[in-house]
């Protein structure tokens, strides 16, 4: 069981705390986090997960002080991930090389290391629940692959995820 845990680097503190708690519960239930090693939401999900229940995809070696020498961290993006990101990004031609690598990294967060195993669901935060920033790439990919998206910036998604989290919590008691 896997989930993608991502979102804005500017995620409000109340949601960062909630993300860490949610990650702890999901980790206890056996879910493996897929995230991207960025500050903000990514780091909150990562902090709540144990090392054996997280897989972190970084766009290049040393991103945010992380290394593929660390357990559960994978570095770099392949041509296929880059092509997939290009196909869903609305303004690819305006992205720098670094931005393109960051968007391609998002492909792994949703589809896994082999780009063939969609997460069970995606948790994120964007202001107002909008498809914005790098998170939008992951949201679009998730939706295209039938992955349910729960955006904590959308009150309806919060309510729906709360129901799912109750079910997951009951399964580990």
Please name every model-derived segment.
Residues 158-173:
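Glycine-rich ThDP/TPP pyrophosphate-binding loop and its adjacent helix/strand module
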Residues 1-4, 9-162:
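Acidic/glycine-enriched connector segments
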